[in-house]
Amino acid sequence: MQFDIIGDVHGCYDELMELIDKLGYEYKRGSYDHPDGRLLAFVGDLTDRGPHSLEVIRLVSHMVKKKTAYYVPGNHCNKLYRYMIGRKVQVKHGLETTVAELNALSEEERIEVIAQFKELYEQAPLYHSFPEDKLVITHAGIREDDIGSYGKRVETFVLYGDITGETNPDGTPVRRDWAATYQGDWWIVYGHTPVRRPRIIHRTVNIDTGCVFGGALTALRFPEIEFVSIPSRQPLVSEKFRNFPG
């Protein structure tokens, strides 16, 4: 199979549409199709912080329903879902922007988009694995030994990365650089941690190039292992990007 795997969108709908066009997709029959039969995939964190989270929800949920795209949830998706089903969550760290968009809708529109997202989230796997391609699409990564497993420990890693339980001064969790020691045969394509440019190491590819923080929105063309990016229209927030050795 041939994929165009897109990093964390975070409500950057305009950049997403520009990227889809640059990748060669055409609007047909209510969805976006590629003339070569390629399929889009999303590594999660569709919403929060950016200006048009609900438009991203509408687009991705429609494409997944039409079976023209794959989606896996990220930690922001998980939090938004818990908010939508009435769980007590803190409306901050970006969620407040999506909630503001929801509150600006009519009741009918709000009910509709909540139903769309809940269906998208509830029907999504924790991660997608494609054995014939030796490919896993996940939000924050996965250990090779955990491919095929879906317990709570695996869920925590997939949504948040290899967290230590400690926190950084800005309140974010301290995460180990799991990719640096990965030795598996599977390609692991993920996002979650904003980097200045796509990071390939040991068959792992981080494609979160921090669009919502003024970086870029990036797609990995698989199996070619080529990158296609669109510059962000958002202001640059340099401190949000992580630098790795080498």
Curated annotation (Swiss-Prot):
The keyword GTP-binding applies. Keywords: GTP-binding, Hydrolase, Nickel, Nucleotide-binding. It is an enzyme of class 3 (hydrolase). One of its GO terms (molecular function) is bis(5'-nucleosyl)-tetraphosphatase (asymmetrical) activity. Its EC number is 3.6.1.17. Its cofactor is Ni(2+). InterPro entries: Ap4A_hydrolase (IPR050126), Bis(5'-nucleosyl)-tetraP_PrpE (IPR023937), Calcineurin-like_PHP_ApaH (IPR004843), Metallo-depent_PP-like (IPR029052), MPP_PrpE-like (IPR041780), Ser/Thr-sp_prot-phosphatase (IPR006186). Pfam families: Metallophos. It catalyses: P(1),P(4)-bis(5'-guanosyl) tetraphosphate + H2O = GMP + GTP + 2 H(+). GO terms for cellular component: cytoplasm. Belongs to the PrpE family. Asymmetrically hydrolyzes Ap4p to yield AMP and ATP. This is Bis(5'-nucleosyl)-tetraphosphatase PrpE [asymmetrical]. It comes from Halalkalibacterium halodurans (strain ATCC BAA-125 / DSM 18197 / FERM 7344 / JCM 9153 / C-125) (Bacillus halodurans). The lineage of its organism: Bacteria, Bacillati, Bacillota, Bacilli, Bacillales.
